[in-house]
C-alpha cells in the first residue's frame, strides 16, 4: 500500500490503476480506524480491483465546541489496519492541501431537507461540511464506487442524494454497522468513554432494538414508543439529543403505513455523543 499526501500524487496513482483496466473503489475516513472501518475496506476490495482510502479530519464538518482538536490522529496504526484490510492507496492530505485558499472562501455543497433535523438540528453546518469534502474527494479520486457505514445513516442518505442530484457516476454502497459483542456500535468516539460509561453505553442499542421489535410486532403508536424508549435511555444515564422513528428513505417522520423505517438516535453519555440506528423493512402491514 502506498501513501500519498497531494492531489497530484493521488490522481497519478489512480490514473495508473485505471489505465490497467482496474475498477476503483473509495473509502473516505477521518482515521482512528477500528474494525468497522476495516469492514468498509474489505467490502470495497470485494467489489473492485483497486481500493483507495482517505484519512482527513475535516474541519469543515466540526462545529464550535466539538472535538476537532482532540479527535485522535493515529496515522501509523491506521496505515497498518488499511493494509491488512486490502487497501492499495491511502490519501492523507493536510488541511492546506484540501482547502488551499482557506475554508472561508471554499465553495460549499448543501443537500437541503435530508440535512435538516436529526443530527443536522444539533450540528448546524455539519452535513454541508460532509457533502463538501466528500464531493471534493469524489472529484479527486473519481471512483467507480464508494463504501460508507450505515451507522451514519443520515450521512449516507445525504451522500446518496448528493450523488444522484449532481449526476455523479458513482455507486454508493452501504455497509451494515459493526458492533461490539454487547451491541454497542463501533465508533472512534467510544474511546472517550470511561469504563463506567462504556458499561452503560450498550443501553442505546438495546433501546433501539426493543423499539424495532415492538414495531415488528405491530406497534404503530410511534410517539408512545419514542417516549418509552427515551425513558429507558434516561434511566441508563444518557442525555437526550434525539430519538425518532423515521421513514428510512426520506427521513420524514414515520407514518403508520410506511414499510421502510429507521429507528434512529443520538445521545450523550457524559460528554461523548453516540449515534446508532436500526433499519426495518416490513414485508406485510400488521394491525
UniProtKB/Swiss-Prot annotation:
Beta-alanine binds at residue 61. It is found in: Cytoplasm. InterPro entries: Pantoate_ligase, Pantoate_ligase_C, Rossmann-like_a/b/a_fold. Pfam families: Pantoate_ligase (PF02569). Its main location: cytoplasm. One of its GO terms (molecular function) is ATP binding. Keywords: ATP-binding, Cytoplasm, Ligase, Nucleotide-binding, Pantothenate biosynthesis. This is Pantothenate synthetase. The lineage of its organism: Bacteria, Pseudomonadati, Pseudomonadota, Gammaproteobacteria, Pseudomonadales. The gene is panC.
Amino acid at each position: 500500500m502506498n501513501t500519498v499526501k497531494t492531489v497530484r500524487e493521488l490522481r497519478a496513482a489512480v490514473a495508473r490503476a485505471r489505465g490497467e483496466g482496474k475498477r476503483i473503489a473509495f473509502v473516505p475516513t477521518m482515521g482512528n480506524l477500528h474494525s468497522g472501518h476495516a469492514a468498509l475496506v474489505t467490502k470495497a476490495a470485494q467489489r473492485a480491483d483497486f481500493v483507495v482510502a482517505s484519512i482527513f479530519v475535516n474541519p469543515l464538518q466540526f462545529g464550535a465546541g466539538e472535538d476537532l482538536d482532540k479527535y485522535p490522529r493515529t496515522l501509523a496504526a491506521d496505515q497498518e489496519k488499511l493494509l491488512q484490510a486490502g487497501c492499495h492507496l491511502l490519501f492523507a492530505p493536510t488541511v492546506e492541501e484540501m482547502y488551499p485558499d482557506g475554508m472561508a472562501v471554499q465553495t460549499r455543497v448543501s443537500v437541503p431537507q435530508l440535512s435538516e433535523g436529526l443530527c443536522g438540528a444539533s450540528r448546524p453546518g455539519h452535513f454541508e461540511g460532509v457533502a463538501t469534502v466528500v464531493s471534493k474527494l469524489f472529484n479527486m479520486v473519481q471512483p467507480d464506487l464508494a463504501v460508507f457505514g450505515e451507522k451514519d445513516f443520515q450521512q449516507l442518505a445525504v451522500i446518496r442524494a448528493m450523488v444522484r442530484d449532481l449526476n455523479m457516476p458513482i455507486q454508493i454502497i452501504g455497509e451494515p454497522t459493526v458492533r461490539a459483542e454487547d451491541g454497542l456500535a463501533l465508533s472512534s468516539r467510544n474511546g472517550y468513554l470511561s469504563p463506567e460509561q462504556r458499561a452503560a453505553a450498550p443501553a442505546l442499542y438495546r433501546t433501539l432494538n426493543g423499539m424495532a421489535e415492538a414495531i415488528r410486532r405491530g406497534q404503530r403508536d410511534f410517539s408512545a414508543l419514542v417516549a418509552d424508549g427515551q425513558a429507558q435511555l434516561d434511566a441508563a444515564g444518557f442525555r437526550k439529543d434525539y430519538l425518532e422513528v423515521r421513514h428510512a428513505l426520506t427521513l420524514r417522520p414515520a407514518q403508520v403505513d410506511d414499510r421502510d423505517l429507521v429507528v434512529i438516535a443520538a445521545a450523550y453519555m457524559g460528554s461523548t455523543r453516540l449515534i446508532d440506528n436500526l433499519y426495518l423493512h416490513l414485508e406485510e402491514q400488521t394491525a
